[in-house]
Amino acid sequence: MARFLGLCTWLLALGPGLLATVRAECSQDCATCSYRLARPTDLNPLACTLECEGKLPSLKTWETCKELLQLTKLELPPDATSALSKQEESHLLAKKYGGFMKRYGGFMKKMDELYPLEVEEEANGGEVLGKRYGGFMKKDAEEDDGLGNSSNLLKELLGAGDQREGSLHQEGSDAEDVSKRYGGFMRGLKRSPHLEDETKELQKRYGGFMRRVGRPEWWMDYQKRYGGFLKRFAEPLPSEEEGESYSKEVPEMEKRYGGFMRF
């Protein structure tokens, strides 16, 4: 009883793997039958696969496929079977990659036929690549030489750049020596003594351009209070006769306009 339970346990454990293997073999055999028939529509691959897996009660399609597989194995020699397997592989590749194989498949086959691989050539893979892709490999070699030349040219340019930087640094040091030697002469020209005397006289004469000499005392007080207002609006200055009356009006104006008069 224990052995039977152990066997059942093993079957349960191995069941999914065996089932997947059987399914793969059934689908492969049915696809092979459908491919080898003159008219693939005579055999339904889906029905054949289901009958092979035992999911359909009828076994007509699967029996026909098995007979076809046995006949092809008996009739075909080993070389033919290998060629047939190659055809099947190419057919699967064509299904998988579609238009790519249609466009470039003939070129790949032609290259394989023109340059078949031998034992010695397999050992020397570089020669085979040279035969197959000769001009392309030469072009790559030329590009490598060009890259080497360009690297040498780059080194020369970098060397020239370093020399130029050294010369610029030397020129900068020379400029520093000149500035140390001549000081403020490089910043601006120094005025002559004659020009300095003239500017001093002009400053003495017109320096206080906004200042007025000989103003009355009441006007000085008035300017202290309302100087900014007068500068902004440039009102006419009162005469000496009107000074007293104008000074009496100032407190009234201050009361009326207050902070507006202050700036």
UniProtKB/Swiss-Prot annotation:
Site (Cleavage): 108-110, 130-131, 210-212, 214-215
Mod. after translation: Proenkephalin-A is cleaved by CTSL to generate Met-enkephalin. The N-terminal domain contains 6 conserved cysteines thought to be involved in disulfide bonding and/or processing.
Keywords from the UniProt entry: Antibiotic, Antimicrobial, Cleavage on pair of basic residues, Cytoplasmic vesicle, Disulfide bond, Endorphin, Neuropeptide, Opioid peptide, Phosphoprotein, Secreted, Signal
Keyword Transferase applies: no
Tissue specificity as recorded in UniProt: Secreted by neuroendocrine chromaffin cells through cromaffin granules.
Pro-peptide positions on chain: 192-203, 213-223
Designated name of the protein: Proenkephalin-A
Compartment(s): Cytoplasmic vesicle, Secretory vesicle, Chromaffin granule lumen; Secreted
Species this chain originates from: Bos taurus
Signal peptide: 1-24
InterPro entries in UniProt: Opioid_neupept, Proenkphlin_A
PANTHER family: PROENKEPHALIN (PTHR11438), PROENKEPHALIN-A (PTHR11438:SF3)
Major localization listed first in the record, in broad terms: cytoplasm
The family this protein is said to belong to: Belongs to the opioid neuropeptide precursor family.
Modified residues (Phosphoserine): 247
GO process annotations (BP): aggressive behavior; behavioral fear response; chemical synaptic transmission; defense response to bacterium; G protein-coupled opioid receptor signaling pathway; locomotory behavior; neuropeptide signaling pathway; sensory perception
Gene Ontology molecular functions: opioid peptide activity
GO cellular component: axon terminus; chromaffin granule lumen; dendrite; extracellular region; neuronal cell body; plasma membrane
Disulfide bridge partners, by residue number: 26-48, 30-52, 33-65
